[in-house]
Amino acid sequence: MIYLITGGERSGKSSFAQKLALELSNAPIYVATARKWDADFQNRIDRHQQERDERWTNIEKEKYLSEIDFSQKTALIDCVTLWLTNFFVDHKNDVALSLEEAKKEFLSIASQKDTNLIIVTNEIGMGVHASTEIGRKFTELQGWMNQFLASNADEVFLMVSGISVKIK
């Protein structure tokens, strides 16, 4: 099964996703896609790791999720926005190339046998309009990837103020 959890910043996506993962498995995998850009990001990563107990296996993977064996496992991937940022930066803001590579990676993990994937993403297009060209390009990339993920997901939840709304 593929579950997509989307919503705005601090809407409760990660908490909902973690609860779902623990309902599906006694030993879920947590895949963090954040790149360690600076000390602040490292502190954020450390804090998030401390929030999860011994039931979780933590994996840090910036881009190539297909290198992880998800077969017969439940995995929470948090989050698509940071994952896409890594492709976008590495491909010098090339939307088409970033989207193509991210889709390819997703299809690779989605085809693994007997896997529960819980994917957290952000609806950044619902917020303030980006003031820079790069910001607008990234918003488009995120929107197109979210549409692709939602079309491939079995269930999609929109988080609003800590409340989950099933939309698919």
Task: Say what each PLM segment does.
Residues 28, 75, 155-157:
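Short, well-ordered beta-strand core segments
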Residues 4, 76, 118-120:
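Structural motif
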Residues 17, 48, 76, 122, ...:
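Residue-level signal for inorganic ion chemistry
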Residues 25, 56, 72-73, 114, ...:
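Short, well-ordered alpha-helix to beta-strand connector turns
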Residues 2-69:
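Conserved P-loop
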Residues 9, 35, 81, 124-125, ...:
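Short, glycine/serine-rich, charged loops/turns that create anion-binding
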Residues 54-101:
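Helix-adjacent hinge/juxtasegments
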